[in-house]
């Protein structure tokens, strides 16, 4: 029974925390497989065409030179097919080995050796930190941490570095790199109903207007917006209205379209689609884990205005995490536990809660430890009471 519960907990942990660890390399493998299939099918069709042409030529009385030329063409196409097949298989093999490496790493979680389990947990923490740093844009720090911890094969650095190139190009107000990324992932972006490529084409149109290249803008619109429909058609109509206004217009909505802040919106849109493409959440696993941990121990006592009930051992009570945990829900506790303010021990039948005349409750063992001459001093109010005045508290 315990083994089944442990397996169930591990399965839940993998689904919640380790999903990106396996999903990203799997999606990469899937993408490379589809690309390899297309490349091999295309090159095979080329070989088939030149072979058919050779057979057609041989059915007559061809000259030797023409046959040699056709044979050279067949050899060339076969060489290209072989090269493309080898490259595709190598790329697939790399992705498959990466998936296997990560699966083997996750299996180490159930090790019976405490030392091995401790090392695995440390690596998991490092992996979370690397991903969080990558999301925050600290690429060099993330790469150094991954290299130092020996987890380069266990984190999705390549995906984030590719995203970095795209984002940097958008910051330079260039669309070519992002459009190339859209082309590489065209089929999946279409299934996601992504509007990123359309937004990029709109921005290119806006930049042509900004440069006062209106004829080029019209040609651009005819080329890329002829198939627009629905909400996209409304955006096209709005953008086309810019042709009648100067680049420095103060009339809305054309002033808003010319706002350079649109490039920042494109970066945000790219990030959103990139995460969706790899089935990642908008927040890092580190952020989600930290929030879950803070919420699990957050109580109303952590936010008392006088600060008298705050515990130095409570992470939520600390200054650095108190504000971060403020919007999070309180801990769910089906059965309450009373904790002594003096010792931090749980008050139960072996350490019954005792109430002083001023209404403050402490554990019996703690009152014994601070009793002097049959008197106790309340740590909160500094009032002095006889030990016999403390009354046992009963919880219904």
Curated annotation (Swiss-Prot):
Protein's cellular compartments: Cytoplasm; Nucleus, Nucleoplasm; Nucleus matrix; Cell membrane
Keyword Cell cycle found: yes
Catalyzed chemical reaction(s): S-ubiquitinyl-[E2 ubiquitin-conjugating enzyme]-L-cysteine + [acceptor protein]-L-lysine = [E2 ubiquitin-conjugating enzyme]-L-cysteine + N(6)-ubiquitinyl-[acceptor protein]-L-lysine
Coiled-coil region list: none
A Gene Ontology biological process term: erythrocyte maturation
Record PTM Phosphothreonine, positions in chain: 28
Recorded GO CC terms: actomyosin contractile ring; cytoplasm; cytoskeleton; cytosol; GID complex; nuclear matrix; nucleoplasm; nucleus
Zinc finger (RING-Gid-type): 314-381
Superkingdom of this protein's organism: Eukaryota
Domain CTLH residue range list: 159-216
Record EC number: 2.3.2.27
Pfam families: CTLH
Main location: cytoplasm
Enzyme class: transferase
Keyword terms of this UniProt record: Actin-binding, Cell cycle, Cell division, Cell membrane, Cytoplasm, Cytoskeleton, Erythrocyte maturation, Membrane, Metal-binding, Nucleus, Phosphoprotein, Transferase, Ubl conjugation, Ubl conjugation pathway, Zinc, Zinc-finger
Cell membrane keyword on record: yes
UniProt name for this protein: E3 ubiquitin-protein transferase MAEA
């Amino acid at each position: 029974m315990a083994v089944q519960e442990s397996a169930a907990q591990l399965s839940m942990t993998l689904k919640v925390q380790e999903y990106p660890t396996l999903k990203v390399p799997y999606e990469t493998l899937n993408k490379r497989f589809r690309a390899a299939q297309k490349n091999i099918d295309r090159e095979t069709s080329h070989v088939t065409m030149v072979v058919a042409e050779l057979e057609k030529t041989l059915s007559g009385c061809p000259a030797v030179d023409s046959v040699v030329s056709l044979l050279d063409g067949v050899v060339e196409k076969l060489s290209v097919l072989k090269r493309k097949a080898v490259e595709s298989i190598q790329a697939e093999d790399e992705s498959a080995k990466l998936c296997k490496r990560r699966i083997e790493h996750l299996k180490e979680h159930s090790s019976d050796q405490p030392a091995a389990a401790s090392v695995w947990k440390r690596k998991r923490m490092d992996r979370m930190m690397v991903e969080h740093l990558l999301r925050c844009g600290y690429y060099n720090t993330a790469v150094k941490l991954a290299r130092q911890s020996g987890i380069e094969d266990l984190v999705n650095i390549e995906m984030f570095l590719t995203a970095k190139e795209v984002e940097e190009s958008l910051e330079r107000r260039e669309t070519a790199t992002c459009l190339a990324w859209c082309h590489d992932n065209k089929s999946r972006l279409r299934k996601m109903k992504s509007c990123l490529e359309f937004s990029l084409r709109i921005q290119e149109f806006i930049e042509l207007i900004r440069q006062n290249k209106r004829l080029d803008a019209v040609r651009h619109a005819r080329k890329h917006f002829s198939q627009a429909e629905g909400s996209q058609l409304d955006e096209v109509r709005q953008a086309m209205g810019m042709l009648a206004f100067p680049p420095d217009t103060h009339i809305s909505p054309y002033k808003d379209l010319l706002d350079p802040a649109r490039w920042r919106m494109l970066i945000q849109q790219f990030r959103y689609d990139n995460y969706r493409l790899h089935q990642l959440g908008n927040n890092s696993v580190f952020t989600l884990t930290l929030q879950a941990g803070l919420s699990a121990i957050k109580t109303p006592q952590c936010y008392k205005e006088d600060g008298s009930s705050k515990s130095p051992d409570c992470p939520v009570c600390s200054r650095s995490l108190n504000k971060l945990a403020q919007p999070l829900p309180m801990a769910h506790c089906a059965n309450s536990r009373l904790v002594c303010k003096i010792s931090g021990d749980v008050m139960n039948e072996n350490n019954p809660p005792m109430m002083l005349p001023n209404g403050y409750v402490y554990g019996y063992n703690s009152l014994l430890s601070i009793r002097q001459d049959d008197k106790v001093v309340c740590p909160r109010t500094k009032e002095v009471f006889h030990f016999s005045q403390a009354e046992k508290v009963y919880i219904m």
